From Swiss-Prot:
Name assigned to this protein: Probable dual-specificity RNA methyltransferase RlmN
Cellular compartments annotated: Cytoplasm
Cofactor binding description: Binds 1 [4Fe-4S] cluster. The cluster is coordinated with 3 cysteines and an exchangeable S-adenosyl-L-methionine.
Amino-acid positions noted as binding S-adenosyl-L-methionine in the UniProt annotation, renumbered to this chain: G157, E158, S189, S211, L212, H213, H287
Leftover remarks: Reaction proceeds by a ping-pong mechanism involving intermediate methylation of a conserved cysteine residue.
Cross-referenced InterPro entries: Aldolase_TIM (IPR013785), Methyltransferase_A (IPR040072), RlmN_N (IPR048641), RNA_MTrfase_RlmN (IPR027492), rRNA_lsu_MTrfase_RlmN/Cfr (IPR004383), rSAM (IPR007197)
Gene label: rlmN
Disulphide-bonded residues: C105-C330
Source species taxonomy: Bacteria, Pseudomonadati, Bacteroidota, Bacteroidia, Bacteroidales
Enzyme category, top tier: transferase
Cofactor(s), by name: [4Fe-4S] cluster
Family the UniProt entry places it in: Belongs to the radical SAM superfamily. RlmN family.
Reactions it catalyzes: adenosine(2503) in 23S rRNA + 2 reduced [2Fe-2S]-[ferredoxin] + 2 S-adenosyl-L-methionine = 2-methyladenosine(2503) in 23S rRNA + 5'-deoxyadenosine + L-methionine + 2 oxidized [2Fe-2S]-[ferredoxin] + S-adenosyl-L-homocysteine; adenosine(37) in tRNA + 2 reduced [2Fe-2S]-[ferredoxin] + 2 S-adenosyl-L-methionine = 2-methyladenosine(37) in tRNA + 5'-deoxyadenosine + L-methionine + 2 oxidized [2Fe-2S]-[ferredoxin] + S-adenosyl-L-homocysteine
Alphabetically ordered keywords of this record: 4Fe-4S, Cytoplasm, Disulfide bond, Iron, Iron-sulfur, Metal-binding, Methyltransferase, rRNA processing, S-adenosyl-L-methionine, Transferase, tRNA processing
Species this chain originates from: Bacteroides fragilis (strain YCH46)
EC number(s) reported in the record: 2.1.1.192
Length: 344
């Protein structure tokens, strides 16, 4: 009989566990401390619980931490990890070390429903949403855990399409009884879903990144079908109701496609669209994927685009591309091969 994972449980849920097992009320905080602060590898290591209570706990629960089943290493130091989340399903997470920081790109779903034209995860289709345990396991089981400084929810899947479990995972990451991270170390990236965006802004203090890619609705809907359900104009109008002028950061991701969205008219329309918002724009180089007739703009074009926006008051950066040689860069994550091979 499968055991229930402790990783991914809130303090309230741990209190229910200890109550059901006849353990003292304070034992829930002890378990949370061992799990999220001391990062034990077995229930036996929870030595301030009595032997009897540890045995009771082991009878129905395990830590719920599973090591990656595979990894790929890039020449630039990026590492892509493959996690098995169930018998037949897998997700990828990407560890990106830098001089002064180390970031983990975390997945929220197996596949994705959004079907963005430029993304391999979308081409894979949607299989399942991850639980808070499966989201946090990508972090807790990371071999480089002790070096990690930042988490970005920019891996496989649309986080706002799995908002209950994503918010639960983010709560545990930032709660004092949990990992105790500052929300300023975490960024959630989304295409922008009407039903989830407002809730995320109001229930989380983590940074927000919106996938933009075109300021023109008709073109954006071709690149990103989600535009048809919740337009970028409506999204911007909603975002203007909130204060992003302090520590919380709002950014817009913009993949620059050659001859598609890289001309001056696009830069001018971006300025018009985002006027009045305290935000930044991150320009991203497109990484070619099979079967997609798009090409990335050159660095000279991207630099000119950035300089125009910045000179007109919109802070803009060019995001460094990492892990392209192992299909770990933006838009390149997919576990379609593993999913298919496990069916056979």
């Amino acid at each position: 009989m499968p055991k229930y994972p402790l990783l991914g449980m809130t303090l309230t849920e741990l209190q229910s566990v200890t109550k059901d097992l006849g353990m003292p009320a304070f034992a829930a905080k002890q378990i949370a401390s061992w799990l999220y602060d001391k990062k034990v590898t077995s229930i036996d290591e929870m030595t301030n619980l009595s032997l009897k209570h540890r045995e009771l706990l082991k009878g129905e629960y395990d830590l719920g931490i599973s090591a990656p089943v595979d990894e790929m290493r890039s020449v630039d130091g990026t590492v892509k990890y493959l996690y098995q989340v169930s018998d037949n399903h897998f997700v990828e997470a990407v560890y990106i070390p830098d001089e002064d920081r180390a970031t983990l790109c975390v997945s929220s779903q197996v596949g994705c429903k959004m079907n963005c034209k430029f993304c391999m995860t979308g081409k894979q289709g949607f299989t399942a949403s991850l639980t808070a345990n499966q989201i946090l396991n990508q972090i807790a089981a990371l071999p480089e855990w002790d070096k990690l400084t930042n988490v970005v929810m920019m891996g496989m899947g649309e986080p706002l399409d799995n908002l209950d479990e994503v918010l639960k995972a983010l709560h545990i990451l930032t709660a004092s009884y949990g990992y105790g991270w500052s929300p300023k170390r975490i960024t959630l990236s989304s295409v922008g879903l009407r039903k989830g965006l407002q809730r995320f802004i109001e229930e989380s203090e983590c940074h927000l990144a919106i996938s933009l890619h075109s300021p023109f609705p008709s073109q954006r809907s071709e690149l990103m079908p989600a535009e048809r359900a919740f337009s970028i104009k409506e999204m911007v109008d909603l975002l203007k109701n909130y204060d992003f002028s302090k520590q919380r950061r709002l950014s817009f991701e913009y993949i620059v496609f050659k001859g598609v969205n890289d001309s001056l008219i696009y830069a001018k329309e971006l300025l018009k669209l985002l006027r009045g918002l305290d935000c930044r724009v991150n320009l991203i180089r497109f990484h070619a994927i099979p079967g997609v007739d798009l090409e990335g703009a050159g660095m000279e074009t991207m630099t000119s685009f950035r300089d125009y926006l910045t000179s007109h008051g919109l802070f803009t950066t060019i995001r460094a591309s990492r892990g392209e040689d192992i299909f770990a860069a933006c838009g390149m994550l997919s576990t379609a091969k593993q999913e298919e091979s496990n069916k056979n």
